[in-house]
Swiss-Prot record:
Family in the record: Belongs to the RNA polymerase beta' chain family. RpoC1 subfamily.
Protein name, as recorded: DNA-directed RNA polymerase subunit beta'
Record-level GO BP terms: DNA-templated transcription
Coarse class of the protein's main subcellular location: plastid
Enzyme class: transferase
Amino acid sequence: MIDRYKHQQLRIGPVSPQQISAWANKILPNGEIVGEVTKPYTFHYKTNKPEKDGLFCERISGPIKSGICACGNYRVIGDEKEDPNFCEQCGVEFADSRARRYQMGYIKLTCPVTHVWYLKRLPSYIANLLDKPLKELEGLVYCDFSFARPVAKKPTFLRLRGLFEYEIQSRKYSIPLFFTTQGFDTFRNREISTGASAIREQLADLDLRIIIDRSLVEWKELGEEGSTGNEWEDRKIGRRKDFLVRRIELAKHFIRTNVEPERMVLSLLPVLPPELRPIIQIDGGKPMSSDINELYRRVIYRNNTLTDLLTTSRSTPGELVMCQEKLVQEAVDTLLDNGIRGQPMRDGYNKVYKSFSDVIEGKEGRFRETLLGKRVDYSGRSVIVVGPSLSLHRCGLPREIAIELFQTFLIRGLIRQRVASNIGIAKSKIREKEPIVWEILQEIMRGHPVLLNRAPTLHRLGIQAFQPILVEGRAICLHPLVCKGFNADFDGDQMAVHVPLSLEAQAEARLLMFSHMNLLSPAIGSPISVPTQDMLIGLYVLTIGNRQGVCANRYNPWNRRNYQNETVDHTKYDRTNYRYTKEKEPYFCSSYDALGAYRQKRIHLDTPLWLRWRLDQRIISLREVPIEVQYESLGTYHEIYRPYLIVKSVKKEILCIYIRTTVGHISFYREIEEAIQGFCRAYSYDGT
């Protein structure tokens, strides 16, 4: 149901026949009520005009051309001086042709028909409410057997059948004569019910509150029994308990929405507006029609045939009537959902008819293609790449996309700062991409968030807000920590960018949708912004360092890498020909000096180095034996261990400590340290 003022809600469900007729019926100025489609015709083959009371009737759906009736007369729409406002000859109103997009019609079904969505979809709502097997209900709907309801103290149809089969020969000829008279119909209609009418009677007799109470009592009784020891019986009891829970929830839903269960059986079939099932002409004048038109025609043909059988002849066999009711049911099933749990109906070219369900469901359906996934203004789309220098709440927006998305804001900014005197001059400056344009664009983007969305949007983290910044190239730059929420990676994924326009949308984006405010999963509460893929590989490369330990550069006569001359003349082998060399590992007093040396390309990211560290006794292991001791001329000496180096004085006092590390480790440590300090400052600020 759509609110006519706000248009913010949509509810799909079974509708009463009175509501369908209210949607479709309209009263003409002469008092005639139109809306029922009775003929299976579309356009006349000679005049190429819609047939009266057909699927494209102008009296029901409105004129094809605005203000022009079927006769060709013209009236000005909305002009009160023009009188009357409809044609008395053809009965077509002088209205807007856009009415053919929303004005419905209906088909009055001669026999009730079950809605296939509620019968054959799993779980079957009708089977759940009636607590009967689906196969049994399908046999009843398609007239394979009948539903008996004998009435006490009255002659019954079943008793007469028994007399016909087992009584004496004297009644052998009198009883069949009775079955061909009108009296038989009285007995049959009173005692026997079949088809969708039997389903409707059973649904109408249901008391939903009693169903809830009885199902709850049975569920409790099954729960108190406990395990039987038989695995098959335990599974059977478990399935029955699950069924009772679904039945209770379904009954509560019908009560909560104030929907009567018998509405799942149709007596009036809505007819879509003509513009939603058009007939068009392609090259050569050949008409092409929507499949729904052919399916509607099939329903009308079979429904009219059933009407003729019931009205024109009183001696029509009951089996023939039931067969025709079955055909009407199958035609409506094909219209609503062709091929549901069975073979689909095909046309003469062996092509499957596209039913109403096929039109609205799926990726190319009416909802996802034209209502939910349609193209909107102030939006763009591009490939995402990693932005290693971005903050968590920022994204890189290409200049080409940004200048288009913020063009209206940019024009206003150029005029407001008197750079351009009117819109035309402002647009010309934007086309020429003058430097002042980028400056104003950066100011605009600084106070305007954007929304990034990656399809499919399976949860709320599939669309988040970011602060945009201008970047070069044509790809959207994204922080790798937010990829898990989007279920995205950098192998060619695309994301859409939207600009919130209203103040309410911008406030919602800032307060609820910014990426740094969505660090936890809304479903289970676990961290959603965790390093994955590219970040893990980057951290590994950053901290891997040189795999050679501190002993690698020490003298080892059996290690060929310790010698300069790699080419050895084995004929003149002499160990004295080789000179031992030891690469000097640099010393740094602070991490700033080490990072400065890396920026000056004096050392590499994984170059081992000694970094002076604060005196911390926890670093020193008393049981560890130094690998090497180096003495200086002034009496001081260096004790070299695997992870650290201690400088001691002549009196064996510790002067300073150096740790063995790399520039990658230093950078990683500083990032973590700054993050912890920032968190502590924010926490202390909130606490005060």
